[in-house]
Amino acid sequence: METTTIDIQALKKELVLDLIQIGALKFGRFTLKSGIVSPFYVDLRIIGPKMLRQFSVLLYHVMTVKGLTNMEKRVICGVPYSALTFSSCMSMTYDLPMVICRKERKQYGTGNMVEGIYTKNETNCILIEDVITSGASIVETAEKLENEGLLVTDALVFLTREQLPLTNGMHILKKGEKVYNVHPCLTMTEVTQVLLDEGKMSQEQREDILQFIGTNTFSETKTTAVPQKKKELTFTERAELTNNEFSKKLFKLMEEKQTNLCVAADITSKDDLLKLADETGPEICMLKTHIDTLDDQPDEQFTQQLKELAKKHNFLIFEDRKLADIGQVVKQQYARGPFKIAQWSDLCNSHLVSGGSATVKALKESLKEENITEPRGLLLIAQMSTEGATTGESTKQEALKVALENPDFVSGFICQSKLRDDLDQFLYCTPGVRLDVKGDSLGQQYNSPEYVVCEKKCDVIIVGRGIYHDKERQNAAKLYRKLGWEAYQKRIQQ
């Protein structure tokens, strides 16, 4: 069977779709041997003769492309036991000499660990594997073969879960001074792309799978399945990941000022709001306002005073407007009307109920129409801190989708936990932070700074009544600043 006459990409596509059809590739929630819960599961033991022959074509194609067919004195060996059918099919189809490696030496018969014909210290052995996760079984088999005098440097694998680093299209496994090159035929990135293109998978499903892969990796030097913990980046490092000017500004401000505290000024007096801003300004990275709840009508003089306090104490202004109407209306609410939010507020937020993409487009247009050039950002409301909130999984997924489509303007999310571990370019801002109580009579639920920052991996703690109801507001702000920043320091050092 000549691979040169076969469309390899078409064959890959056919195999992916067939794997789904027969149930060899499943999506859902599966607990692996390591204890990790995976969004997909692969079982190639159920494939039939036709697919086995097609697998052999792909494996031999990679073997040829990588120059392994040019090796002198070579044999192949399937990693016991699931890959033995692969190596047997390749051996018969392409006339390749084959050996069999046992998992353990038998105490009867020949007692050989390796069965087959080879010359010690001369014969090269190419390993064949079905699926690779950590690479432990490949290294273990290679060591057994080497102990019997075979030379092992390379392995072919049908599918990689991509939980090992890929270098020039291959995995590099190390054990001591030994190095093994693993050449995959197919990656989960390719698999999910085929399923997306064929309408068998949504973009959100694909992103969840790729996120899982990115956050559940294994060290290339390990031979046991020990997941690598993702390095927690500093705010300074995360500022380099984004082209969003507001996000850059806030990340850098938090690091320089050493505060991730936002005070929620949910009060009804202009004078009291300005007083609170002046009292707590030295301790905060942002001041959150509700301009439409003030009893005395705010005017341009008031917003100018607020901007001057922000400049004096080096904090940013966040208007908690929760825009939710159709595009044309939110344009007016944001840039015009009695409040002219875009003129003085660095950051605003929005629900997704009227269509997140349309809302973002309208807000960006309003900035352009009003000729506002200062950095402006938007937080999408993905999760809320009130009991019974209807912001469920679909809201979260829509928020992620809109944010990824508009990274220049969407700075992050209002949320109760970090939405995706691999999206460090976004800000995760959490209301409902308080130390002394767990909730109120209207359904608000509170969490501690350490829980929000360390456990839930959020960035900005938003504190309202815990500060503005305190008789010593400045001291309360100092305390929350200290606790929030200590939690951040603890997180990045873990």
Curated annotation (Swiss-Prot):
GO BP field: 'de novo' pyrimidine nucleobase biosynthetic process; 'de novo' UMP biosynthetic process; UMP biosynthetic process
Species: Naegleria gruberi (Amoeba)
CDD domains to which the protein is assigned, alphabetical: OMP_decarboxylase_like (cd04725), PRTases_typeI (cd06223)
SUPFAM superfamilies tied to this protein: PRTase-like (SSF53271), Ribulose-phoshate binding barrel (SSF51366)
Metabolic or biological pathway: Pyrimidine metabolism; UMP biosynthesis via de novo pathway; UMP from orotate: step 1/2; Pyrimidine metabolism; UMP biosynthesis via de novo pathway; UMP from orotate: step 2/2
Xref: PANTHER family: OROTATE PHOSPHORIBOSYLTRANSFERASE (PTHR19278), URIDINE 5'-MONOPHOSPHATE SYNTHASE (PTHR19278:SF9)
Highest taxon, organism lineage: Eukaryota
Keywords: Decarboxylase, Glycosyltransferase, Lyase, Multifunctional enzyme, Pyrimidine biosynthesis, Transferase
UniProt binding sites for orotidine 5'-phosphate: 288, 322, 325, 385, 444-446, 464-465
Residues forming the catalytic site: 322
InterPro entries, A to Z: Aldolase_TIM, OMPdecase, OMPdeCOase_dom, OPRT, PRibTrfase_dom, PRTase-like, RibuloseP-bd_barrel
Any one GO MF annotation of this record: orotate phosphoribosyltransferase activity
Entry protein name: Uridine 5'-monophosphate synthase
Family recorded in the similarity comment: In the N-terminal section; belongs to the purine/pyrimidine phosphoribosyltransferase family. In the C-terminal section; belongs to the OMP decarboxylase family.
Binding, UMP: 266, 288-290, 325, 385, 444-446, 464-465
Enzyme Commission no: 2.4.2.10, 4.1.1.23
Reaction(s) catalysed by this chain's protein: orotidine 5'-phosphate + diphosphate = orotate + 5-phospho-alpha-D-ribose 1-diphosphate; orotidine 5'-phosphate + H(+) = UMP + CO2
Function: Bifunctional enzyme catalyzing the last two steps of de novo pyrimidine biosynthesis, orotate phosphoribosyltransferase (OPRT), which converts orotate to orotidine-5'-monophosphate (OMP), and orotidine-5'-monophosphate decarboxylase (ODC), the terminal enzymatic reaction that decarboxylates OMP to uridine monophosphate (UMP).
